[in-house]
């Protein structure tokens, strides 16, 4: 498995996190299996020669023989997500749905955009709009049955947000998987594709409202971008106006300063004091 983060964002951020106690983690880990795995590692103390080539008469068969292991991965991940949920009181699923139970318009995304989409969905639900979003927690292997199970039966339109660009391809990976899953499941649903966040370009609630507006429009863009002004291929969506997404108990501050005037240092000290000496959650981005 690969867990990946935005390197620039995480290197310019201070955030308060909750840490698990190792005693709580122990029941989730089969240490005998870990030891057996490590014994197979290549190292000078246990040298071994392994086949460096495989003839074409058997290579294809061996590649296909591994299918069952990949097919079992969703069940294994789901099992351990449920174990984590029991210990931490969380609700991790392979595909988490959030929003109106009878939503007609849904955004599917994963990673850094998930929280802003969730807060925007709550904002639009309060305004009476039947919208929702699906947060993808397991991208590979892609569990089509779990996605279709998470998707409300009332959904008519889906917007998929990818944080990557695949020049020359028909579209980006998550969009292609979601579209194939919807077709495979026999669902008559419109699916469109958006790109966001390249080089940490910000996406705000006004962008997500624009996604839902574009999704519901009769002449909306099938392929679009967020957070930029594309005056070359004209794929970008204009940010919606008048969007005020409020989170109860949240205080936000923005500071301006000149280089070396101490603004960054003072804010780093302040956010660390708040995080270390209060029960409040604290986050800072520089």
Please give the residue ranges for each predicted region.
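Short acidic, glycine/serine/threonine-rich loops at helix termini
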Residues: 12-19, 118-120, 144-146, 169-173, ...
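Glycine-rich beta-alpha junction loops
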Residues: 5-12, 111-113, 164-165, 195-200, ...
